Swiss-Prot record:
SUPFAM superfamilies from the UniProt entry: C-terminal domain of alpha and beta subunits of F1 ATP synthase (SSF47917), N-terminal domain of alpha and beta subunits of F1 ATP synthase (SSF50615), P-loop containing nucleoside triphosphate hydrolases (SSF52540)
Organism: Geotalea daltonii (strain DSM 22248 / JCM 15807 / FRC-32) (Geobacter daltonii)
Subcellular localization, as worded in the UniProt entry: Cell inner membrane
GO molecular function: ATP binding; ATP hydrolysis activity; proton-transporting ATP synthase activity, rotational mechanism
GO CC annotation, single: plasma membrane
Name under which the protein is recorded: ATP synthase subunit beta
Enzyme nomenclature, EC number: 7.1.2.2
Amino acid sequence: MSQNIGKISQVIGAVIDVEFEPGKLPPIYNALRVTNPAIDDNENNLVLEVAQHLGENSVRTIAMDSTDGLVRGQAVLDTGKQISVPVGRKTLGRILNVIGEPVDEMGPVNADKEYGIHREAPEFVDQSTKVEAFTTGIKVVDLLAPYARGGKIGLFGGAGVGKTVLIMELINNIAKQHGGFSVFAGVGERTREGNDLWMEMKESGVLDKAALVYGQMNEPPGARARVALSALSIAEYFRDEEGQNVLLFIDNIFRFTQAGSEVSALLGRIPSAVGYQPTLATEMGELQERITSTNKGSITSVQAIYVPADDLTDPAPATAFAHLDATTVLSRQIAELGIYPAVDPLDSTSRILDPQVIGEEHYAIARQVQYVLQKYKDLQDIIAILGMDELSEEDKLVVARARKIQRFLSQPFHVAEAFTGSPGKYVELKDTIKGFKEIVDGKHDDIPEQAFYMVGTIEEAIEKAKKLAV
């Protein structure tokens, strides 16, 4: 088959128009290749993805790398297929870019199989309808805002409250307890953070259980708008071909939308609300619908969500919320108390915190814990003004238990062992429920609150109390 070659007719930033001979237009989503001397000395080093057909013989494409150095009339090769990325176990421990090339200087990936990045969501008949909780081993999450297997979790939090550490602990727990793999998509985030994550994962020994796909802030919008899809294809392979329960991390889902909005105007689309692309909900839906449980395995995704100007009604975060099953909110106030993970127990929510899914006992204890913490929050103003002595005996008891619960919600992480000096703890769900039940029932009213800080199970708290008493 002869090669289909076109030529560049127009370059507008990240958007390139390419002219082909009549009747030889490449289909939408096809990958085209062109040589850009400004990137490096390799031939056909720039990938363009067909986004629109213009008239008889022109296509409008989005570039996946820098377009500086391109000129009109340059030859463009149609590869005849969409952007494909290597999949399978060879991708574990590697860093890939949007087009599946390794960027960790550790040689080629040599995978046996490739997947296209645009794939159909699983058919209804293949999807699993069973709703079950996904145990993470992190007490605060499992008790108060449990994750659903094959669900989507939004991770909210400002800078420096522990999003990355929480993500790394989840990767660690999935690898060690469930033997599963994780895929991390760095979408439009800081390159330094991407490097830090790689280094920390290497040090904590979880790197060989995860594949990393990066399209960071310095990349053109084309790469940032597609890198989440590349990572998702790698995760889909582990789910569909190996029957794994995969964890997919997307940091940050807002940047996916932001990149789409950057190229949307260049593609000639009329902007919609707040200047976002008119296809915002469709693009988000195409990505999110592929993240699901099937009869073979599941992809559970944790997505960090940046909220522009803290406005939750902004179209970008608002569209993402529509797809979420659970939210984990990290709070600076809790981090300031030294309680890590700094998850806000009253602000975090889950769709499966429901007695029909998690059982009556778990549900009742979670609600009791929330009640005690809420009551303590309501009493804090009185305590600040009048002091503890002005409270009734009943309220004093509530405050004492709430402070114990607050500390018992903290937990030493495996990935933070190097910094904290205490060994990490994975807490089974039954132990979590038992521990909080005993605190709420008043079985440990005699134990000092510091005994509950940074321990795993309630037995450890009792042991710690004995040591403190000596």
